[in-house]
């Protein structure tokens, strides 16, 4: 239930705000898509943990690149 809510909120962000902000993520998949995949694969709590770890790497001093959900 919580996982579905989180995925729904992320998808809402992807459909509404993300197009206005433009492509900024230095990773593939994007951080929001990574969050969706992590939550769907690992559940709400563990997926959120993986997402927080990923977001902590999303800054100008990190090279980025391909970073799939474990």
UniProtKB/Swiss-Prot annotation:
InterPro entries: Membr_insert_effic_factor_YidD. It is a peripheral membrane protein. Disulfide bonds: none annotated. The keyword Membrane applies. Keywords: Cell inner membrane, Cell membrane, Membrane. One of its GO terms (cellular component) is plasma membrane. SMART domains: Haemolytic. Its main location: membrane. It is found in: Cell inner membrane. It holds the Pfam family YidD. Belongs to the UPF0161 family. Could be involved in insertion of integral membrane proteins into the membrane. This is Putative membrane protein insertion efficiency factor. It comes from Methylobacillus flagellatus (strain ATCC 51484 / DSM 6875 / VKM B-1610 / KT).
């Amino acid at each position: 239930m919580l996982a579905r809510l989180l995925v729904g909120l992320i998808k809402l962000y992807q459909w509404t705000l993300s197009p206005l902000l433009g492509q900024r993520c230095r990773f593939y998949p994007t951080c929001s898509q990574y969050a969706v995949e992590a939550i769907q694969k690992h559940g709400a709590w563990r997926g959120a943990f993986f997402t927080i770890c990923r977001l902590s790497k999303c800054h100008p001093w990190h090279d980025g690149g391909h970073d799939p959900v474990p």
